[in-house]
Amino acid sequence: MDFYYLPGSAPCRAVQMTAAAVGVELNLKLTDLMKGEHMKPEFLKLNPQHCVPTLVDNGFALWESRAIMCYLVEKYGKPCNNDSLYPTDPQKRAIVNQRLYFDMGTLYQRFGDYYYPQIFEGAPANETNFAKIGEALAFLDTFLEGERFVAGGNGYSLADISLYATLTTFEVAGYDFSAYVNVLRWYKSMPELIPASDTNRSWAEAARPFFDKVKH
């Protein structure tokens, strides 16, 4: 199973941890966006959106990290861990989906809105966008009130994996989220629970140079 990825990318790391959780071995294909490797004809044939992560499973190509994560669990997950990772109960699954969409459309989006213009465009820091990150973290802190996992329940889910990858990027970027006590408690507990969290951390370090000159 081929996995086209960039180490510093939180979505790529989330897929990598999901694969480890369901026991799938990935054939890693490092894709350097700075060198335009994602624009090569052979890659565009797989993924016309030319983005990573991209998974190719026996000729079946799929991109968007959360879609890939769900696919891996539904196809390769074992009954013993499936119901925690991506529950079959409609309401429990809906909560996991909601948290995944929260990560994609709110937390990770707001992180990108603040940091990426500074990194890639040399734009000045936007304090309004910075404040919106704090608001998103406050939402996550509320989700975790009285809960061990972001979607509740007795085991980590795909939502925990995705958000853990995102928060690892926050830490590497130098963003201090220690004021969000529930988030901090949860974040510190994840490395002992999520498989390949050590790889998540080491891969995330690849992004550190991009954040060195960004205002926090």
From Swiss-Prot:
Q: Where does glutathione bind?
A: S9, H50, C51, V52, E64, S65, R66
Q: Give a yes or no for keyword Glycoprotein in this entry.
A: no
- What's the superkingdom here? Eukaryota
> Can you give the residue ranges of the GST N-terminal domain?
1-80
Please give one Pfam family short name.
GST_N
Record's keyword terms, sorted? Transferase
Q: CDD domains of this UniProt entry?
A: GST_C_Delta_Epsilon, GST_N_Delta_Epsilon
What are the GST C-terminal domain coordinates in residue numbering?
89-210
Q: What biological process terms from GO does the record include?
A: glutathione metabolic process
Q: Name one GO molecular function term.
A: glutathione transferase activity
Give the catalytic activity.
RX + glutathione = an S-substituted glutathione + a halide anion + H(+)
Q: EC no.? A: 2.5.1.18
Any keyword Transferase?
yes
Q: Supply one GO CC term from the record.
A: extracellular region
Q: What does this protein do?
A: Conjugation of reduced glutathione to a wide number of exogenous and endogenous hydrophobic electrophiles.
Q: How does it assemble?
A: Homodimer.
Protein family: Belongs to the GST superfamily. Theta family.
Q: Could you tell me what this protein is called?
A: Glutathione S-transferase 1, isoform B
Q: What is the lineage of its organism?
A: Eukaryota, Metazoa, Ecdysozoa, Arthropoda, Hexapoda
Q: What gene name is given for the protein in this entry?
A: GstD1
